[in-house]
């Protein structure tokens, strides 16, 4: 798995050839590619891995997505091996989705409970 974190200017700084090569290699190997905040738009879009996929990012960066991408406002979007999320307020849901994929749903549920996620 490769995870591209968000924030600015960090997301823009990830849009370099070395990161692009790494992302494309992970995609070719069928590995999970995860990204949050502005990074899906600024760092993943140039790699081509978002072409034809359903994706999300921090509001205002959507115009950087490829025309073939299906834009979503969901907190976390999973399309095949690519997982994207919107930003700081969705980071917990993003993290739990990664746990579901790396470990299993039961472990993610235990973490959710331990964090008092559903506590009133």
Predicted regions and their residues:
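Active-site-adjacent pocket-lining segments in enzyme domains
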Residues: 1-120
């Amino acid at each position: 798995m490769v995870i591209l974190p968000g924030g600015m200017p960090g997301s823009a700084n990830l849009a370099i050839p070395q990161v692009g090569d790494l992302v494309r290699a992970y995609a070719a190997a069928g590995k999970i590619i995860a990204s949050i905040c502005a990074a899906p738009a600024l760092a993943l879009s140039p790699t081509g891995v978002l072409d034809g996929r359903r994706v999300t990012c921090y509001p205002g960066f959507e115009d950087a997505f490829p025309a073939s991408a299906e834009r979503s406002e969901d907190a976390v979007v999973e399309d095949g091996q690519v997982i994207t999320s919107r930003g700081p307020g969705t980071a917990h849901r993003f993290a739990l989705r990664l746990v579901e994929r790396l470990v299993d749903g039961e472990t993610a549920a235990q973490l959710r409970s331990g964090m008092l996620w559903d506590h009133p």
